[in-house]
Amino acid sequence: MRRATQLFGICWLLCLLVACGESHFMTDASYRSRVEQDFQQKKALMPQGELFAILDDASLSTYEQEALEFLYAYMPLADITDYPGEFHLMNIRASQRAAEEMPWGKNIPEDLFRHFVLPVRVNNEQLDSARVVFYKELKDRVKSLSLYDAILEVNHWCHEKAVYMPSDARTIPPLAPVAFAYGRCGEESTLLVAALR
């Protein structure tokens, strides 16, 4: 009996250590609580189906869980229904990777990262995997630059990829101007924001 109690105690301590070692996406507990409430309200609007099933994945880190809840709390309803949770998780992991690997990534204030880097949507474009594709293409080009110079370099890269051409069509996704080598004003700005993220 004593051995079972010791084993239980050791397992409990290990679980506690693992849980304490995980980083939060939102370090401010009161803000985290507000996001959780907003997420629960959004979830209540959409009770049918498995729209939030990704959050049941036990392998998610605390950071990923909180980032998903943040995105779901504030994204348009159509982005919840039109794109699977795995898509949003892929983008969370890609943004976290960039923040960890770029020398200035850890210096981005948490609130700026949360509201201006993490979100996928820029405009009314269809969402795509631009964040992953652009990171692979841009990381070596900007990794040794200051944040200021990296921003300028990404802007130059966008100009290399696409030039302005007017059209009346809906805003195309960020990968499209690269493929077509042109885009409208909104498409070029969407390309730049997606590349900067």
Which positions does each model-derived feature cover?
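Active-site neighborhood of thiol-dependent amide/isopeptide-bond enzymes
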Residues: 140-197
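N-terminal accessory/pre-domain segments preceding catalytic cores
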Residues: 20-151
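Short hydrophobic/aromatic-rich motifs at helix boundaries and adjacent loops
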Residues: 5, 126-127, 163-166
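Bacterial N-terminal signal peptides that target proteins for export
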Residues: 1-9
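Bacterial N-terminal signal peptides
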Residues: 8-17
